[in-house]
Regions:
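Substrate-binding/active-site clefts of carbohydrate-active enzymes
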Residues: 2-181, 189-196
């Protein structure tokens, strides 16, 4: 339900709502009538993917560079007001539930939008996501203190030897389930979460 090529002509969705949580909610009755029981959304955590590409000038709209694990991506919200993306996301989930669909999220906890090979220097650890707060607790570091890419191939690797990182994931999952109403999760590169 993205405004990207291939989805631009969805019927019955007003142009300003295409690619938004509100637009997706409008599709709920149709998807339920098809007999679907679950909808899985690609990552919806706040991200900086459109600003930080692998190469200068490139963009990435997939959402796999998480910036904030507790915030719905405001780019997918028609309501940009304070709290608007959260309200709109919850309304979308309610619409899917009313149509008999469960909502699963594709979640990315193996890495974040922090530095690494996406930055100007692969040794960079900045203040994009969690770096600078407790970098060694959140990220795997090499002997020189630089971020390691490890098994993710995507910029850095979260440090799940750290209780702080483990708590972040559990708290985030509890939030998305208990507060936002999400029913299940698909974990990107799930084996990385078990590495110590």
């Amino acid at each position: 339900l993205s405004p990207k090529p291939g989805f631009a002509g969805l019927p019955d969705i007003p142009a300003p709502l295409r690619g938004t949580y509100a637009g997706a909610a409008m599709m709920a009755p149709y998807l339920g009538a098809l007999g679907l029981t679950v909808i899985e959304l690609l990552p919806v955590h706040e991200t900086d993917s459109d600003q930080v590409g692998a190469h200068a000038g490139s963009t990435n709209h997939w959402g796999y560079q998480t910036l904030a694990f507790f915030a719905p991506n405001r780019d997918y919200s028609s309501d940009k007001s304070l709290g608007g993306p959260t309200r709109e996301f919850k309304e979308m989930v309610a619409a899917f539930h009313a149509a008999g669909l469960k909502v699963y999220l594709d979640v990315v906890y193996n890495h974040s939008a922090e530095g690494g090979n996406w930055a100007d220097s692969p040794d960079a650890a900045g203040f994009t996501s969690l770096g600078g707060f407790a970098t060694a607790d959140y990220y795997g570091l090499d002997a020189a203190g630089g971020l390691i890419d490890g098994a993710t191939g995507t910029s850095n690797q979260m440090n799940y030897s750290s209780p702080l990182s483990c708590a972040l994931v559990l708290d985030s999952l509890e939030y998305w389930h208990g507060v936002m109403g999400v029913d299940g999760f698909r974990f990107d590169l799930a084996p990385v979460l078990g590495r110590r």
